[in-house]
Amino acid sequence: IRYGEVGGVPVEGYLVRPKAARGRLPGLIVIHEWWGLNDNVRDEAARLAAEGFVVLAVDLYAGKVATQPPDAMKLAQALTANPGPAEENLRAAYAWLDEVEKAPRIGTVGWCLGGRWSLRTALLLPDQVDATVIYYGTVKADEGVLARLQMPILGLFASQDRVVPAATVTAFEATLKRLGKDADIHMYEGADHGFANPSGTAYEP
């Protein structure tokens, strides 16, 4: 579905609603890993929609999908170097769920790179996003930044993750608690980065 424009260029994503759904449903912005909007993310979007959400899986790579780590790294680095278009993209996704789908509540969820952007979306729209879920996304214990968060935060991390070390997660959690935020941070012992990806080698069902 085409859900907005970034720099005058249309952006498309994957929209899923529960079968036989009626009325207004809570919305969920789903943000892909560093691979891009691939079949695994579409499957996750469908699974989440079956729980009663209208789900919009965004595409931050303008249609590009990587299958090898070096290619994924290039796409992720380009996104980090120029985050403005991604921010505009995610604002458009929120606006679609809010204005077109009339979702009464809207949350964000993402894995890996998408986990970082799930948190970033919550920081972009702190008075609008109603909940944010971070699966092993890069986080920082910056009080000045995290103070803006106004919604419940769920963080799911892995003890063996070298991308997002346990010490970083501990500092992040401590900062959220010090700020009095509604945060639920889980550290899965023995798990590694990517543990929630059924198509990956680190999957822990």
Regions found by a protein language model. Give the residues of each.
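Short alpha-helix in the alpha/beta-hydrolase fold that links the catalytic acid
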Residues: 44, 165-175, 184
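Serine-hydrolase catalytic machinery in alpha/beta-hydrolase-like enzymes
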Residues: 1-100, 194-200
